[in-house]
């Protein structure tokens, strides 16, 4: 949250140069406050686990967040009861005419399938297109990030010979950016995917900006220049045991997976994993919710045209 300071306080310029969020008394006095409305399209097999992971991150902010859960209406969930889906999830037709402050679209275990061959690809495209007019900011995670980059910008992913699984070092590619406030120069983040986007094509695209990257895992955080779409190529929401659970699942299925890198203590799968990404994962979602949702969204959700002062400086 911002530090409120007197108008024209000399420290303001210094703090802003250090990427510290300050707000003048005048702006603070005119700021309307209400709960943020966030929609989550949950494509992961274990709905309840993913709900919990995302709500844990959304709940770790000073903002009140009202959450709606969205499903693909004609896709049966094999790992979650129909009662749970009917009780807590909405079909797209129930939200089509609504506007939201934020939308999160999760990953999905579809990394080796061409986008057009995904059974519900048309529904994904429809929701992405809808979001560009009805949502202030969209956070795409892992597979959803690849899918949206393909659909919105025509960028293709490259399939990997072996699943990329582990916790990798990333670095900032820019210093003064609202989304990166509080980030260390280097930080850790988990990945679990069968494909990657070319770092070169992402950097070359005039409508995109790469904010963080890894020598091993490639691009991690990519933001559209209109600030509406944030593409995160990994899983900041993963809990400590998620990569371990996926590894043992793949072993049981005879897939001969590599041991997740930099994850188990001493890289020994017989030992417990070490979670070293939760702090930055929480900060990522908190910064997105604050700077790209709360500070940007209009008080009246019928009007989706508002911009923040820092946008004018980009």
From Swiss-Prot:
GO terms for cellular component: cytoplasm. The record marks 111 as: Important for acyl-CoA specificity. One of its GO terms (molecular function) is homoserine O-succinyltransferase activity. InterPro entries: Class_I_gatase-like, HST_MetA, MetA_family. Coiled coil: none annotated. The active site is at residues 142, 235, 237. The keyword Protease does not apply. GO terms for biological process: L-methionine biosynthetic process from homoserine via O-succinyl-L-homoserine and cystathionine. Gene3D superfamilies: 3.40.50.880. Its EC number is 2.3.1.46. The keyword Amino-acid biosynthesis applies. It holds the Pfam family HTS. It comes from the Bacteria. It catalyses: L-homoserine + succinyl-CoA = O-succinyl-L-homoserine + CoA. Its main location: cytoplasm. The record marks 192 as: Important for substrate specificity. Belongs to the MetA family. PANTHER family: HOMOSERINE O-SUCCINYLTRANSFERASE (PTHR20919:SF0). Transfers a succinyl group from succinyl-CoA to L-homoserine, forming succinyl-L-homoserine. This is Homoserine O-succinyltransferase. It comes from Shewanella woodyi (strain ATCC 51908 / MS32).
């Amino acid at each position: 949250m911002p530090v409120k300071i007197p108008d024209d306080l000399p420290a303001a310029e210094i703090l802003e140069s250090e990427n510290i969020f300050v707000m003048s008394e005048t702006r603070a006095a005119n700021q309307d406050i209400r709960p943020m409305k966030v929609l989550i399209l949950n494509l992961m097999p274990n709905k309840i686990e993913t709900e919990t992971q995302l709500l844990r991150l959304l709940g770790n902010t000073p903002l009140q967040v009202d959450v709606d859960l969205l499903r693909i209406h004609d896709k049966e969930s094999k790992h979650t009861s129909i009662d749970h889906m009917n009780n807590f999830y909405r079909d797209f037709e129930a939200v089509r005419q609504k506007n939201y402050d934020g939308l999160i679209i999760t990953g999905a275990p579809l990394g080796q399938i061409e986008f057009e061959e995904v059974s519900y690809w048309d529904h994904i495209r429809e929701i992405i297109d809808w979001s560009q007019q009805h949502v202030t900011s969209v956070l795409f995670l892992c597979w959803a990030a690849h899918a949206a980059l393909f659909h919105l910008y025509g960028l293709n992913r490259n399939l990997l010979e072996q699943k990329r699984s582990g916790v990798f070092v990333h670095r900032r590619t820019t210093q003064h950016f609202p989304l990166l406030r509080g980030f260390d120069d280097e930080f850790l983040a988990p990945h679990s995917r069968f494909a990657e986007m070319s770092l070169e094509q992402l950097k070359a695209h005039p409508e995109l900006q790469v904010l963080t990257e890894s020598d091993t895992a490639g691009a991690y955080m990519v933001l559209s220049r209109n600030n509406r779409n944030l593409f995160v190529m990994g899983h900041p929401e993963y809990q400590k045991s998620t990569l371990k659970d996926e590894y043992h699942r793949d072993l049981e299925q005879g897939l001969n997976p590599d041991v997740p890198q930099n994850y188990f203590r001493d890289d020994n799968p017989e030992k417990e994993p070490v979670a070293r990404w939760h702090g930055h994962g929480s900060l990522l979602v908190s910064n997105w919710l604050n700077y790209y949702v709360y500070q940007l969204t209009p008080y009246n959700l019928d009007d989706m045209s508002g911009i923040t002062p820092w946008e004018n400086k980009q």
